[in-house]
Amino acid sequence: MINRNVLAVALLMFSLVMVQAGCQSAVAPPTNRAETPPPPHKVDTAAIEAEVIKLEREWADAVKNGDADAARRVMADDIAIVNPDGSTSAKAEEVNAIQAKTVTMDSWEILEPKVTVLDENNAFVTGRGVIKNGKAKVPNSSKTIDISGEYRFLDVYARRNGKWQAVASQTTPIAQAAGKNP
């Protein structure tokens, strides 16, 4: 009888261990539950679009008015710029040119800006810029060239430390048909 009692207790303990083991998953939970990030918070695209367009206009006004401080605020320190003539420049060169007023104009209109929001910290804007009565001094010369006309632009903005700034800019002149004004 003792053997039977020992066997019954052993079977009971074995059964309890098996039941407990069955309650705990031997397989890792599905990764789609464990690895899925929480739903992203909604990006306020309207606010980003408004801020980027505001900065775009401030930048044009800064160049037009010779306001180097305003241009400094809009441009990131590491901005990469492709100018309408295909040359490249950096922030320091642009700020120096603005301070020296190497470019003058009656107006610089930003038309048809279209902002594409990539995420909460990155966006780009495309559009047209129209410069009226624009003149640019030729470096190392007393000559000026007429820069009046219509341009297409692509400017990339990034929010860093809570502040939006232009990190890349590219401007292309649009050829005008003879006798047409922008």
Question: Residue spans of the language-model regions?
Answer:
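N-terminal acidic, proline/glycine-rich, low-complexity intrinsically disordered segments
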Residues: 2, 23-24
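Bacterial N-terminal signal peptides that target proteins for export
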Residues: 1-10
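A beta-strand edge to alpha-helix "cap/lid" segment located at domain peripheries
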Residues: 24-73, 80-182
